[in-house]
Amino acid sequence: MLKRTVLAVLSGLAILSTPMVAAEARTLDEILSEGVIRVGINPNFPNMSTRNDAGDWEGFDIDVGNALAEGLGVEVEWVPTETPQRVPFLVSDRIDISLGALTRNASRAMLIDYTVPLHTEVLAVLATSEIEGDSWEDFNEDGITLANMRGNWTVGWIEENMPNVELELVDTLADTVRLVAQGRADAIVENIDFFMAFTENHPDVDWRVVENPIFVAYCAIGVAQGNENLTEVLNILLYGMHSSGMINETWEAHYGSPMLREVVPTPYF
């Protein structure tokens, strides 16, 4: 965990060392007056935000963005925003808010503001009943093969923190789950929420998530720094969406299972 913390700090320093010229963000009054809110979404994030066969956007973030816009009484302008562009697009006023699983961390909070949490990300172990283990450390053994995806940051985390395992890398979420289902890998160590829907493709496998997660991160909506009125209204809308169960129901509809660690709504923010 120490190594991961050091990497996170270095990553944060890299962000802070990158020149970003802050533009004046649109105020809540301007958004309401123009009748449009610009929402940054990942253009290729299955179950979160992607285009369907008809070319329309769909996914968890899309439903959330539409609900927020409805609460504000405005229309949505979807702005494709790749993962590295989320903070720069807020700082440069290309978007009003950023979705796309924007994890809270201190380095980003020096550049942008966050709402209350929207959802969580849980780094955990997805395995089957064919293999024993009550914690992620139990899987750090010779003879264990973990499935993962090329380019995922968790590959580096596994190499540093679970040096005894073998890694089998593929290119998609579905292929990662398939490796375990076919017995070509023993488990997956990842942000497991994003993989759960694909376990339904293999109903004969007795899937299980190791109870103790490695860590839980909170993802919130990114807002331009100092845009307090917009942030406050979004927080109130999110509190209502969490309290009504809309967030959890929408998550389960798109991911096929409940959030592993649900966000507990609080009226204080």
What are these regions (language model features)?
Residues 43, 119-127, 192, 196-239, ...:
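Periplasmic-binding protein-like
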Residues 25-101, 110, 169, 253-254:
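Extracytoplasmic small-molecule ligand-binding "clamshell" domains
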Residues 27, 153-170, 238-269:
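Ligand-binding clefts/hinges and TM-proximal coupling segments of bilobed small-molecule sensing domains
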Residues 127-145:
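Flexible hinge/capping segments at coil-to-helix
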Residues 37-38, 74-75, 92-100, 143-145, ...:
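Alpha-to-beta junction loops
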Residues 77-88, 133-134, 168-182, 217:
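Short helix-initiation/N-cap motifs at beta->coil->alpha
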Residues 63-71, 130-131, 137, 152, ...:
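Extended ligand-binding regions for polar small-molecule ligands
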Residues 85-88, 102-110, 159-160, 181, ...:
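A ligand-binding cleft/hinge motif common to bilobed small-molecule-binding domains
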